[in-house]
């Protein structure tokens, strides 16, 4: 869960998180759509996430990156290109995916794929 939130806000955050998880492949996933799905205004959604310690945009981006990182780590990883994995989780371009992945995890998606493969073989 994100930072400190009231129980009412936690329920809204949980609902928003579920909606984001279900719609993560949509590159057009925006705060306005998430807010509408949860039944609150975009401003309320932004405030609740900010109060909990993260902007809604950053939360969506981090969720995309977490899903992509997991996909790069699965046994089927070599059957799907890095670009396709980025696209699958809503990144508009391979360069945007690679850049944001590297900023967060300090390695490129391809480096992560190779590292996770190496770890799999060592286990």
Stretches with model-predicted labels:
Residues 1-3, 15-17, 66-68, 83-84:
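A short, structure-level motif marking secondary-structure boundaries and short turns
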Residues 12-57, 75-88, 92:
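DNA-binding recognition helix and immediately preceding turn/loop
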Residues 75-115:
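Sequence-specific DNA-binding recognition helix
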Residues 121-123:
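Intrinsically disordered, low-complexity protein-interaction/activation regions
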């Amino acid at each position: 869960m994100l930072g400190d939130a009231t129980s009412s806000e936690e329920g809204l955050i949980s609902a928003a998180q579920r909606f984001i998880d279900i719609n993560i492949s949509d590159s057009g996933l925006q705060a306005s759509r998430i807010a509408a799905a949860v039944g609150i205004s975009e401003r309320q959604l932004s405030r609740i996430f900010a109060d909990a310690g993260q902007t809604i945009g950053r939360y969506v981006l981090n969720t995309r990156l977490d899903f992509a990182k997991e996909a790069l780590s699965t046994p089927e990883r070599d059957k799907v290109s890095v670009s396709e994995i980025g696209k699958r989780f809503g990144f508009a371009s391979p360069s945007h995916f690679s850049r944001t992945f590297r900023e967060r995890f300090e390695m490129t998606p391809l480096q992560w794929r190779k590292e996770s493969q190496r770890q799999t073989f060592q286990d």
